[in-house]
Curated annotation (Swiss-Prot):
Catalytic activity field: L-glutamate 5-semialdehyde + phosphate + NADP(+) = L-glutamyl 5-phosphate + NADPH + H(+)
EC numbers, comma separated: 1.2.1.41
Alphabetical UniProt keywords: Amino-acid biosynthesis, Cytoplasm, NADP, Oxidoreductase, Proline biosynthesis
InterPro entries tied to this protein: Ald_DH/histidinol_DH (IPR016161), Ald_DH_C (IPR016163), Ald_DH_N (IPR016162), Aldehyde_DH_dom (IPR015590), G-glutamylP_reductase_CS (IPR020593), Glu-5-SA_DH (IPR012134), GPR_dom (IPR000965)
UniProt name for this protein: Gamma-glutamyl phosphate reductase
Subcellular localization, as worded in the UniProt entry: Cytoplasm
Role, per record: Catalyzes the NADPH-dependent reduction of L-glutamate 5-phosphate into L-glutamate 5-semialdehyde and phosphate. The product spontaneously undergoes cyclization to form 1-pyrroline-5-carboxylate.
Length: 427
């Protein structure tokens, strides 16, 4: 039976107990066999499919709670589970099981002149705290990824997704038990009190090794401000697409519409379109027509309005806004130099795309823009661990330390050195 608490008068005591259980579970996980971890993952996927109706019923209750509120449609989309999304959740877990086990991998080795043989070996991080909002699928993705990398995980979902996340957690715990692994290897914080987040950020008496926030700007800002443990920061998307004068127009139009409108509520959705001034006469209106026909609202700069009047005027705030909605800001820039300047000023360093046939333009874009993911002639919606072949992701890390870009199994490991000698002593 899983621990369930409606509310606790002593959040710190509750959370510290969760931390101790996670730390205890992390020890046997660190050297659990690949076979046992994969067996647990397979059982988790089976349980999710077997309990699909229950998961969807609990998700329907979560959705009912937000009915009539003023939340964005993109928020509701992230919260919503369907039969297809539940099936994809299970398939994602199976894909993680099929990945190579990173734990114990020797990824560097060398010999010293004194005869010492040195190896750098991947090891689990230990206990990972994941704080997320409105995305019940993160429960499955984070639980499975952390397990594959030999880590215990403490999950703190938003109150909006608590029923869905609990239903998914039950499937994950069933998988752990089926493989004989510690059931506290994956835990969901059973209270909605925000003090639980504060307790996690303080490290739960040293039991949490790293925090991964997955949510809006206010959550990530709080985590970065208050955390006393390392953070894999997943900032807002604010993705840009630059259309160079050398771009193929048909390709550019298809990519821009997909990058913005495939799913507007994900962090890989394009929020700003930059068009080379040399291509404005030929490319701008067809690009805007494609977006408008797809149901997207255009926020245009004065330069754009001179060529295509009648659109809503963009404000300074628009250039730094992650809409997560069917809205895009558009401006004209002075070639690749102007695009680099604009992106460098407003980007969150998440994902940017260049649509161009000129290799020199692509090379400058890739060299001079310092975002975690850069794409050439491809939609920003590919900014996803599953699309990168990682099975799934905990988030897109936009910082520069350790993990960057999609945080998958390999990024959830650290390393240690193994040094083999034959009796050497240091002179």
């Amino acid at each position: 039976m899983l621990d369930t608490v409606a509310q606790s008068p002593d959040i710190d005591a509750l959370m510290n107990d969760i931390g101790r259980k996670a730390r205890a579970a992390s020890r046997p996980l660190a050297f659990a066999s690949t076979e046992s971890k994969n067996r647990a993952l397979a059982a988790m996927a089976d349980a999710i499919l077997a309990r699909k109706d229950h998961i969807l019923a609990e998700n329907a209750k979560d959705l009912k709670d937000v009915e009539g509120t003023d939340i964005l449609a993109s928020f509701v989309d992230r919260l919503t589970l369907t039969e297809k999304r539940v099936a994809e959740m299970a398939e994602g877990i199976r894909a993680i099981a099929a990945l190579p086990d990173p734990v114990g991998e020797v990824f560097a080795a060398w010999d010293r002149p004194n005869g010492l043989k040195i190896e750098r070996v991947r090891t689990p991080l230990g206990v990972i705290g994941v704080i997320f909002e409105s995305r019940p699928n993160v429960t499955a993705d984070a639980g499975a990824l952390c397990l594959k990398a030999g880590n215990a995980v403490i999950l703190r979902c938003g109150s909006d997704s608590r029923r869905s996340s609990q239903a998914i957690l039950e499937c994950l715990v069933e998988g752990l038990k089926a493989a004989g692994l510690p059931e506290h290897a994956i835990q969901l914080v059973p209270v909605t009190d925000r003090a639980a987040v504060g307790a996690m950020l303080r490290g739960l008496e040293g039991t949490i090794d790293v925090i991964v926030p997955r949510g809006g700007k206010s959550l990530v800002a709080r985590v970065q401000s208050e955390a006393r443990v390392p953070v894999f920061a997943h900032l807002e998307g604010l993705c840009h697409v630059y259309i160079d004068a050398s771009a193929d127009l048909d390709m550019a139009k298809a990519i821009v519409v997909n990058a913005k409108m495939r799913r507007t509520g994900i962090c890989g959705s394009a929020e700003t379109l930059l068009v080379d001034a040399k291509a404005a006469q030929t490319h701008l209106k067809p690009l805007l027509d494609g977006l408008t026909e797809a149901g997207c609202e255009i926020r245009a700069s004065t330069e754009v309005l001179r060529l295509v009047p009648g659109l809503k005027t963009a404000t300074e705030e628009d250039w730094s806004t992650e809409y997560l909605d069917a809205i895009i800001s558009v401006t004209i820039v002075d070639g690749i130099s102007g695009a680099i300047d604009h992106i460098s000023r407003y980007s969150s360093n998440h994902t940017e795309a260049v649509i161009a046939e000129d290799p020199a333009v692509v090379e400058r874009f890739f060299t001079e823009i310092d975002s975690a993911i850069l794409l050439h002639n491809a939609s920003t919606q590919f900014a996803d661990g599953g699309e990168f072949g990682m099975g799934a992701e905990i988030g897109i890390a936009t910082g520069k330390m350790h993990a960057r870009g999609p945080v998958g199994v390999e990024q959830l490991t650290s390393f240690k050195y193994r040094v083999h000698g034959t009796g050497q002593i240091r002179p």
